[in-house]
């Protein structure tokens, strides 16, 4: 089963050494705002990525939660530990919001 977390729980993973937060949205959306520390890997390019660390929990978020579930499912199949954010970035109202390229 895919582990899901609420958008509020996303703050728990920010800044942790054992987690990698991945923003699956388009580059333009990421540039406008994103969760602090998140790396931008647009969903369309994710399938070809072979360089993601096996020793970290991959925390995926997208716009509303659909793509992140699909990504989490795929990477669990590859042997990773994953989390998918329910409701995606749209639901996130946490304190780790970054606007622009800060």
Name every feature range the model reports, one short phrase each:
Residues 1-20, 27-57, 63-102:
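Rhodanese-like catalytic fold shared by cysteine-dependent sulfurtransferases
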């Amino acid at each position: 089963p895919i582990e899901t977390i609420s958008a509020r729980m996303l703050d728990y993973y920010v800044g942790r050494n054992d987690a990698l937060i991945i923003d699956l949205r388009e580059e333009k959306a990421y540039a406008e705002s994103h969760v602090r520390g998140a790396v931008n890997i647009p969903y369309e390019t994710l399938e070809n990525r072979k360089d993601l660390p096996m020793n970290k929990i991959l925390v995926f978020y997208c716009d509303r939660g659909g793509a992140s579930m699909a990504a989490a499912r795929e990477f669990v199949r590859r042997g990773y530990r994953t989390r998918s954010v329910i409701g995606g970035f749209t639901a996130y109202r946490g304190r780790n919001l970054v606007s622009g390229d800060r």
